[in-house]
């Protein structure tokens, strides 16, 4: 098969968008859990090598957000069930990939004028080399501006899925979360292998 002429192609990142992974009520419950039950989360850190040892360190030159692992087993079970029922079948269908492992869920908050994650890959260090796909569910589209995903190797296109929808993409793809300009962007993320 011959490639399409340039006029018929669009340079866009190979990202799977899955609508309705979480329903709005679950999204609202996850935001409440992060803000109330988990005290707003902790400042997100990055893993660095220091004096021959791996350490977590806050580095606003790389990312700035709050995060927590869910502390409510019932909420976590609801998230897992929806992932199994709504997202994983699409990953098999589109990427021909059978998920066998999932990293812990993380709830994220990207606050106004202080929420971003500069361009990075999700599987570059030995502790995360097992990761194959990232999955991120937007929890409150429309309550903020900015905060879109961008894949700079594939052009300027921005991705901001609706509330409850997921983006799934290869952990090897360079990507960023652009700065949040107004409001707070909430999301849930995990990594699949």
Sequence positions of predicted segments:
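Fe(II)/2-oxoglutarate oxygenase catalytic core
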Residues: 1-134, 138-166, 172-193
């Amino acid at each position: 098969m011959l490639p399409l002429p340039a006029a018929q192609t669009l340079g866009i990142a190979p990202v799977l968008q899955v609508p309705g992974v979480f329903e709005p009520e679950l999204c609202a419950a996850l935001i409440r859990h992060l803000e109330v039950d988990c005290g707003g989360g902790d400042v997100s850190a990055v893993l660095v090598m220091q004096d021959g040892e791996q350490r977590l360190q806050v580095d606003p030159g790389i990312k700035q957000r709050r995060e927590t692992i869910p502390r409510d087993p019932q909420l976590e079970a609801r998230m897992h069930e929806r992932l199994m029922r709504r997202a994983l079948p699409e990953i098999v269908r589109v990427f021909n990939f059978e998920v066998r492992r999932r990293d812990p869920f993380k709830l994220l908050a990207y606050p106004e004028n202080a929420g971003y994650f500069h361009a990075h890959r999700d599987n570059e260090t030995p502790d995360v080399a097992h990761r194959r796909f990232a999955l991120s569910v937007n929890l409150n589209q429309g309550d903020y501006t900015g905060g879109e995903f961008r894949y700079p190797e594939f052009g300027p296109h921005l991705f901001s899925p609706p509330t409850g929808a997921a983006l799934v993409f290869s952990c090897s793809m360079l990507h960023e979360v652009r700065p949040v300009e107004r409001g707070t962007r909430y999301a849930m993320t995990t990594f699949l292998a």
